[in-house]
Amino acid sequence: MVTFGYGVEATGYAGIKPASFLQLQRINNIGGITITPATIDASALEDSVTKTVAGRGETGGTWTVTVNFTSETKTEWANLISAYQTAKASGLNMWFETIVPGFEDAFFVVAQPPEAIPMPEIAQNGLLTVEFPLVIVDVKGMSAKVAFT
């Protein structure tokens, strides 16, 4: 099963992957992140056809995680938001880890959660879910996974 969680950088270790991560429960969907390079016009006046080169990569800015919204997950995400606010005040980042079975490494992303729990989508005879838009700070990619606590 795929597992997902977060960790906060330790004091004195800003920019370093946290040594511990807390697992979040009832995750329904973890959005993908595609880094799309911007194109830069590298044409000269004598060129009859535009020449482009790859520029800085663009992540799209946000990354959505959908959660089955229960009293337990509400508490988990309230604690996450509080942990982020404490970390931010100390100049530290929050990292998110996605562990996929069969891989030795996990996916890591540095991101900022919303300041409050968003209103969930409510549908007739539907599962109560909430989408958390995480602002992408840095896509770290895959590296050695850290076991969840």
What positions do the PLM features span?
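Short beta-strand and beta-hairpin "edge-sheet" elements
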Residues: 33, 97-143
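Compositionally biased, intrinsically disordered low-complexity segments enriched in polar/Pro/Gly
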Residues: 1, 6, 142-149
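Short intrinsically disordered coil segments
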Residues: 79-85, 128-131, 146-149
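Short, acidic/charged, Gly/Pro-enriched secondary-structure junctions
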Residues: 75-111
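Acidic glycine-/aspartate-rich tracts in secreted/extracellular proteins
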Residues: 69-73, 139
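Solvent-exposed edge beta-strands and adjacent loop segments
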Residues: 1-69, 112-127
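Short, flexible coil/linker elements and helix-boundary hinge sites characteristic
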Residues: 5, 91, 136-138
